[in-house]
Amino acid sequence: MKIKLVTVGKLKEKYLKDGIAEYMKRLNRFCKVEMIELANEKTPDKASDLENQQILEKEGNKILAKINEREFVIALAIEGNQFPSEKFSQLMMDTTVHGFSDITFVIGGSLGLYPAVKKRANLLMSFGKLTLPHQLMRLVLIEQIYRAFMIQQGSPYHK
């Protein structure tokens, strides 16, 4: 199985980089993990709705260019489905049963995701109604991916 994270924006904080690196190292025994960071578009302080839409579209097109036809795409969006960790673990494992060997997770930038990215996604997923920095969301997501594998292994990590 190959897992790809397509994210908008450069990760700057060392503590987040260190946490993500640790979980990526742990995941190596289960799957190949690839992190793709796309440059975010500069957003003016008082951007108009039209400017925001144009920025979303540019970022969305960059994201779509990194998604292959045969990947199962899970886009993180506030309106998406919420899952307990056990259900998320089962969902990840079920994708292989349905003929997908690659799962791509998408995390948008500060403006969210362009509608075409949401449309391309096989699943919209949410970690709740809270607003989190998209950089922090990377760490939360990769930990949950690791937890999903630990649940499948019957590991006490999940307790």
Curated annotation (Swiss-Prot):
It is an enzyme of class 2 (transferase). It comes from the Bacteria. One of its GO terms (cellular component) is cytoplasm. S-adenosyl-L-methionine binds at L76, G108, F127, G128, K129, L130, T131, L132. Gene3D superfamilies: 3.40.1280.10. Keywords: Cytoplasm, Methyltransferase, rRNA processing, S-adenosyl-L-methionine, Transferase. Its main location: cytoplasm. It holds the Pfam family SPOUT_MTase. GO terms for molecular function: rRNA (pseudouridine-N3-)-methyltransferase activity. It catalyses: pseudouridine(1915) in 23S rRNA + S-adenosyl-L-methionine = N(3)-methylpseudouridine(1915) in 23S rRNA + S-adenosyl-L-homocysteine + H(+). Homodimer. NCBIfam families: PRK00103.1-3 (NF000985), tRNA_RlmH_YbeA (TIGR00246). Specifically methylates the pseudouridine at position 1915 (m3Psi1915) in 23S rRNA. PANTHER family: METHYLTRANSFERASE, RIBOSOMAL RNA LARGE SUBUNIT METHYLTRANSFERASE H. This is Ribosomal RNA large subunit methyltransferase H. It comes from Streptococcus sanguinis (strain SK36). The gene is rlmH.
